[in-house]
């Protein structure tokens, strides 16, 4: 189905190009089924084969278009949760403009992902497929890993090929060099399958060896996780279940005070050591000098509270997780670094068009990328919402002493697709850092994740939930924590060597 004649015989096409591009879009959609919530992780090992094949037979421009079509199928279907933004009538936007806005944002995000796969296809058709088969494999793997690394530093980053292996696939490989390890293995298998179809006998042997080695290494890394030592830490979490369209109203704020105060008292009676709330649990500007029911309750119980709220700063406000000690005083806070585009900040060039999308009365300011969140039990890694997708955000905090991970999010108004993808990101972060992770959300899915990546408890969505989690502090180091993404520079170095050798031969 996917085979086309050589470039020199383009007039004798087996398939018309429009049908080819539709087929590539379907292939991208099929690869998306490897992501949560379906989590058919094995599909990722063949999902890019049709695109790789076409890079070998299409001219660079047509290959780029093919990559865009595959990307729209993959990223477009994996980001359908953006549609849940509609309706936005609760912030004064009429139904039709609301529908158009949600689809426009989805199209923008999908296209940004499609540019990644389109760029990969363009570079492969222009440079990669001109090499011998082993070097072509290196080009394909390295280019995709490099593009993902570049995209991961953009404000629109969310979907990585590594997410296809979470929570039940080859997640343990993330201990070696973070998401790049998993992405590299997925791309290697796709490349070897493609080359095998072109009658490359060595590729079939390499394919079998790669699959066996990856699965075996994943198993070995899982069973070699060090046992927990020391005293357990009991963390209570409160899933408030107050929809955003409600909690930003006076009645919603009143309900938030009531719900989180009630949950705090209940968890304290269960004997927890600390209590965790979701992102923006109290959607107000926190005033440290003023007494309120929360600080009074903390002073009375003496149990620390990690509270999601907002704090005023010069020029705006921070989305923060506060650490209130047993006296109700702020002893540490973490300001959200990676703000959600359009929802939490408006790019200047879009300000006049979509300013009404924001419900904020003052602009949110990103937090300092180099923050340390201290607790009575040592430093903790904090990930607020969107930050779960950025592995470098958690790694920096791990290097600076993070002993467990606190992931807090709102996740409303989005439903199961986004919730499970977000949970999948947190599984990757727990495994990469070899840390216990407590995930607390407003509407679900809250969770407790072990350093092995196993989800020990998962809440139901759209319900009020309180839960007491037992976790352990850890000070172990994975290769990724110690050395970061060392694999990508290695791949780039090998790629540079291949280019130099090629020039030397000429």
Swiss-Prot record:
GO terms for molecular function: N-acyltransferase activity. The keyword Transferase applies. InterPro entries: Apolipo_AcylTrfase, C-N_Hydrolase, C-N_Hydrolase_sf, LNT_N. The chain crosses the membrane at residues 10-30, 33-53, 57-77, 105-125, 139-159, 176-196, 205-225, 483-500. It is a multi-pass membrane protein. It is an enzyme of class 2 (transferase). Pathway: Protein modification; lipoprotein biosynthesis (N-acyl transfer). GO terms for biological process: lipoprotein biosynthetic process. Its EC number is 2.3.1.269. Residues 238-473 form the CN hydrolase domain. It is found in: Cell inner membrane. SUPFAM superfamilies: Carbon-nitrogen hydrolase. GO terms for cellular component: plasma membrane. The active site is at residues 279, 336, 385. Keywords: Acyltransferase, Cell inner membrane, Cell membrane, Membrane, Transferase, Transmembrane, Transmembrane helix. Belongs to the CN hydrolase family. Apolipoprotein N-acyltransferase subfamily. NCBIfam families: lnt. Catalyzes the phospholipid dependent N-acylation of the N-terminal cysteine of apolipoprotein, the last step in lipoprotein maturation. This is Apolipoprotein N-acyltransferase. It comes from Thermosynechococcus vestitus (strain NIES-2133 / IAM M-273 / BP-1).
